[in-house]
Structure formats: C-alpha cells, structure tokens
C-alpha cells in the first residue's frame, strides 16, 4: 500500500512524502504497518503482522504499485485525486478515487468473476462510477476469456472496449471495436496514450465523446466450413450443441458455405451479462443482425461502431 494513517490519524502518502517517520496504521483494518523501501518493490507500507485485512492485499506486485503511482502523478495536476481511498460504506479501497465520483481500479491479476461482479455492483449501488484498467497479466490477446467479457465497457461510438496499462512502455491502451469471429478470435482496433500526455479523464471519456468514427475491414474466412467440420470431428461442445439445434430444424452445419455463415465476425455475447455495462443491448444486437443481413457483397466484412448500424442504409 502507498498510504497509511499517521499517529494523528492523517493520511500519509509515500508518493508525496518519501521519508516517513513515526508509527503508522492501515487505513482499512487499523493494524500497524511498516514502511519498506527496496530494489524490487517501490517504497510502500506493509502490515507488521500477517492478519486478515479485507481492504489491502499483502502480496501487491511491483507492477501494481508502479501503475498506481504513474496514474496518480498523471491525475494530480488536473483533478482531485485520492490514492487508495478507503470507502468504508462499501467495504472497498479504490486504487484511485477521482473527483469524489470515479474509482479507477488497476487489476494486474485474475480474480473470480463473482468477485468482480460484487465489487462493481457495490460501486454502482453507491452511485459511483468504476473503471477497470488491466495490467499485463490480463491484456487482451487472441481470444476474449469469460473474465475479459466482464471487464468490457460499451459505447455507441466505439462499441465494446476495454483499457490496458503497460508499465514497461508507460502507456495506456484503448482496445475498441472489439468483435469475435466464429473461431473465437478477437478483432479490434487500438489507440495508445503515453503516460502523462493529455488530460487522463478526457482520454477515459473518449469512447463517449463526439468523434470521427473508425472502421475495420476483414476478408471472408473461406476456410470456415473446414474449421467447423474439424470442430465437429473433435467433438467441440459448442459446435455439437449448434449442430443439434440445426438437426432439429432439418438442417446440417456441414452443408453451409462460407457465405452462408456471414457475418463471420460478430459482437461479443455473454450468457451472464456484462458486469460493467448497465445499458440494455438488445437493440444493438438487432441492429447489427439487420445491417449485415442486408449486405450483398459477402467477400469482406467492414466492422463499424454500433451507431452506424442504427442509421438507415
């Protein structure tokens, strides 16, 4: 942790006061903490004795400490920001609490989906916004995991999106227009923002700002029928379930051509919903299906922000 309470009960921040003196305690549980400074982990506080503290973790990584420090330095000149703000009313600590309304959470490692849902819901029920920024262990690669889907946000101008933090390159990344193809591979665009350049809150609001709209062009996956045949041969549960559904209608997956599977690339879906998205997406999916259902040239697929699908063709 980067903050502690001094003997007068005042918050002490090691980023602003690098040489603390005296006794300090945890802002969450009240237990004694010790100031530490080493070569691997940046200066921080740690509990003197191992005990159950539901607010702060004892195995905080160097990456997590560094990223919180970078974001704090980026925000402090433009916004009211509190580092590791203890929100006792909801039993949580916000990594950074901005303008008394926005919690920025730096998540560097996996966590149970149920835990993410509970933490997000607690913020929402308290009338607070929360934005999760993902460290290296959770960066988006070729596939969207079930956990990734629970970090997704949504806007009409940038579609499904999420944020990544790179401590080595010192940059913030916006992965947007996130789609999945029928093989489960991710298709998206990326914007990069170097740490400290520009107003961070304005950057984080970008998905909802008025802007020139982007698009992404992908060729038709002509090898898709062979891929589906392989999946059925190896008894993929998802494809077997879909084949059973087709059989019930007197159809067969193996007789469909690549063009008949159009669009090959689709919006992410989640059977349990999306923890970060409170908007009803029913019309978004309907607009998407209707738009591509009217496309005659199926040799390519151009992916647009959802606002485009709502406009008459």
Which positions does each model-derived feature cover?
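Nucleic-acid nuclease catalytic cores
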Residues: 126-158
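Short, charged, amphipathic alpha-helix that recurs within catalytic cores of restriction-modification
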Residues: 115-128
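A short acidic/basic microdomain associated with nuclease active sites
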Residues: 72-90, 96-99
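Non-catalytic C-terminal interaction segments of nucleic acid-processing enzymes
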Residues: 152-313
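Conserved catalytic cores of phosphodiester-cleaving nucleases, focusing on short active-site segments
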Residues: 96-112, 123
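Acidic, metal-coordinating catalytic cores used for nucleic-acid/nucleotide bond scission
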Residues: 89, 111-112, 138
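N-terminal cysteine/histidine-rich coordination modules
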Residues: 1-76
């Amino acid at each position: 942790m980067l903050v502690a309470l001094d003997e007068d009960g005042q918050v002490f921040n090691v980023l602003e006061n690098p040489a603390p003196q005296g006794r300090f305690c945890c802002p969450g549980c009240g237990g004694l903490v010790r100031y530490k400074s080493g070569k691997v982990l940046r200066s921080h506080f740690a509990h003197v004795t191992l005990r159950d503290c539901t607010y702060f973790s004892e195995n905080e990584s160097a990456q997590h400490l560094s990223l919180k420090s970078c974001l704090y330095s980026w925000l402090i000149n433009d916004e009211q920001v509190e580092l590791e703000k203890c929100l006792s009313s909801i039993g949580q600590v916000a990594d950074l609490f901005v303008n008394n309304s926005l919690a920025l959470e730096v998540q560097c490692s996996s966590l149970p989906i149920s835990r993410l849902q509970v933490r997000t819901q607690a913020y929402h029920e308290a009338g607070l916004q929360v934005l999760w920024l993902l460290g290296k262990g959770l960066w988006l690669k070729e596939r969207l995991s079930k956990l990734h889907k629970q970090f997704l946000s949504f806007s009409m101008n940038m579609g499904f999106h999420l944020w990544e933090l790179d401590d080595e390159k010192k940059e913030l990344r916006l992965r947007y227009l996130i789609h999945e193809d029928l093989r489960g591979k991710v298709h998206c665009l990326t914007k990069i923002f170097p740490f400290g350049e520009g107003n961070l809150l304005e950057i984080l609001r970008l998905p909802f700002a008025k802007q020139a709209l982007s698009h992404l062009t992908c060729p038709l996956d002509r090898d898709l029928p062979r891929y589906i045949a392989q999946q059925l041969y190896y008894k993929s549960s998802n494809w077997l379930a879909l084949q059973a559904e087709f059989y019930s209608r007197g159809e067969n997956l193996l007789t469909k051509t690549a063009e008949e599977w159009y669009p090959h690339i689709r919006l992410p879906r989640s059977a349990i919903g999306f923890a970060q998205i409170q908007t009803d997406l029913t019309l978004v999916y309907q607009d998407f299906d209707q738009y591509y259902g009217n496309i005659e040239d199926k040799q390519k697929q151009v992916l647009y922000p959802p606002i485009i699908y709502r406009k008459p063709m």
